[in-house]
Amino acid sequence: MNIQALLSEKVRQAMIAAGAPADCEPQIRQSAKVQFGDYQANGMMAVAKKLGMAPRQLAEQVLTHLDLNGIASKVEIAGPGFINIFLDPAFLAEHVQQALASDRLGVATPEKQTIVVDYSAPNVAKEMHVGHLRSTIIGDTAVRTLEFLGHKVIRANHVGDWGTQFGMLIAWLEKQQQENAGEMELADLEGFYRDAKKHYDEDEEFAERARNYVVKLQSGDEYFREMWRKLVDITMTQNQITYDRLNVTLTRDDVMGESLYNPMLPGIVADLKAKGLAVESEGATVVFLDEFKNKEGEPMGVIIQKKDGGYLYTTTDIACAKYRYETLHADRVLYYIDSRQHQHLMQAWAIVRKAGYVPESVPLEHHMFGMMLGKDGKPFKTRAGGTVKLADLLDEALERARRLVAEKNPYMPADELEKLANAVGIGAVKYADLSKNRTTDYIFDWDNMLAFEGNTAPYMQYAYTRVLSVFRKAEINEEQLAAAPVIIREDREAQLAARLLQFEETLTVVAREGTPHVMCAYLYDLAGLFSGFYEHCPILSAENEEVRNSRLKLAQLTAKTLKLGLDTLGIETVERM
């Protein structure tokens, strides 16, 4: 049930009847304060200006045409022309019943699209670090939300599995007689990578051999391809352990590494030349873009093939976008890549559009994000100043959560405690990130994220168990409740019901904007409203059975909404804490 969309269409029709143009926008918003109703229509100012009339006058005319019978109990004009809409308690009660009768809590499915989501993208032969966390979990929230809404989602893990580093690694492995790479752990490869880079920089003979190995690898030599495949396999096996720990939905089948697009690159360069988009410049092949200027104010040159015939990331990203449209048949492509890559992506996509590889009707969206910072406001590092490995971060989260959970549950069985600690610890790390606007940097703080107060995973998980405890005390099951009516008489009942029915609107925003913090804010607000409702509207000691059962149903929908909302974030819920 999308009340916002329903009201938007009703108010828009009334605006048109009052003389507004057919493309007018009512600007229906959830009201910030209860005295302004449940929703506000804020679009009168902009439309009235076009019509040359006072906004309040337009609002008055709109009200004469606005039929919200059975939806709103009161509609009033406020200030210069805002229209405040108060939802009818009977309308709320009816739709709470409908939501409870639905496995999807009444959430509709929009027109199905094929959506490619590019996220995580670790590098081969390197362990995942904290810099991969944001892309991985924000992207996974988008995937979960879009799939719940009924879209066909293709996960694209754009793994860095190609380039000169493989010449270095294979040459060094060979030198160290470690050709059976399949038996090695990724931690060994990290050391090998550092040693290989050191030798590459300091030993010209070794560097030359590494460059030759890259050529052999790229030419398809089976020995070198097999070594490369082993390196990829070790890396992705290790990464899968991290994905499973993080409770994200990526699997090995979702890997679409840079190497996938290699066969396309020569044809793309030739095609861009044939279309007059790419030209030779100082030995390289370059596309000059008017949309981007260099320091002299001239069109910026984007290299797609180097003098030595090598290709660049831009060339791969052009091929990647083309593949996602032509082969995967994407209607929309979302990229969860950090903000530092924005100009690079914009340049690649400008070339993609000019070449006609992806039509303008198919959105290519960079859902960029900021950095994770330490308490000092600088990029999050180890005490020694090194990069924090993601596995180490999750280990520490689990250890801290174990201590926290054991302190609160001294007699809990060990296996149950471990399961609870895992849900709390991993959930805390994820929620702390997801609850922040993805476009901003944020401070990583263990104490805040593991707190049982505020907008945190432990608080949300506890809020869920608190609602469940009401049912345990009531000793009533869902089947017994099903036939009971929902009756809304108290203000706090109405406020909770209205917020519960805004779940679909929240999902729609997350799906459109890729903003998990909107879902976190909604769930936190919902938990707070339930707390106020529970305090002021007795459930188990209600004045009669009808009121008791009605309030139990509001509690029931609250529990289901919290669980489903947290599930879209990949946050595990628990029955007891």
From Swiss-Prot:
CDD domains linked: Anticodon_Ia_Arg, ArgRS_core
GO molecular function, one term: arginine-tRNA ligase activity
Annotated compartments: Cytoplasm
A biological-process GO annotation: arginyl-tRNA aminoacylation
Assigned EC number: 6.1.1.19
Keywords of this entry: Aminoacyl-tRNA synthetase, ATP-binding, Cytoplasm, Ligase, Nucleotide-binding, Protein biosynthesis
Broad class of the protein's primary localization: cytoplasm
SUPFAM superfamilies, sorted: Anticodon-binding domain of a subclass of class I aminoacyl-tRNA synthetases, Arginyl-tRNA synthetase (ArgRS), N-terminal 'additional' domain, Nucleotidylyl transferase
Keyword tRNA processing annotated: no
InterPro entries the record matches: aa-tRNA-synth_I_CS (IPR001412), Arg-tRNA-ligase (IPR001278), Arg-tRNA-synth_N (IPR005148), Arg-tRNA-synth_N_sf (IPR036695), ArgRS_core (IPR035684), DALR_anticod-bd (IPR008909), Rossmann-like_a/b/a_fold (IPR014729), tRNAsynth_Ia_anticodon-bd (IPR009080)
Catalysed reaction equations from the record: tRNA(Arg) + L-arginine + ATP = L-arginyl-tRNA(Arg) + AMP + diphosphate
Motif ('HIGH' region): 122-132
Any one annotated GO CC term: cytoplasm
SMART domains: Arg_tRNA_synt_N (SM01016), DALR_1 (SM00836)
Keyword Protein biosynthesis: yes
Record's subunit section: Monomer.
PANTHER family from the UniProt entry: ARGININE--TRNA LIGASE, CYTOPLASMIC, ARGINYL-TRNA SYNTHETASE
NCBIfam families per record: argS (TIGR00456)
Similarity section: Belongs to the class-I aminoacyl-tRNA synthetase family.
Protein name per its UniProtKB record: Arginine--tRNA ligase
Lineage of producing organism: Bacteria, Pseudomonadati, Pseudomonadota, Gammaproteobacteria, Enterobacterales
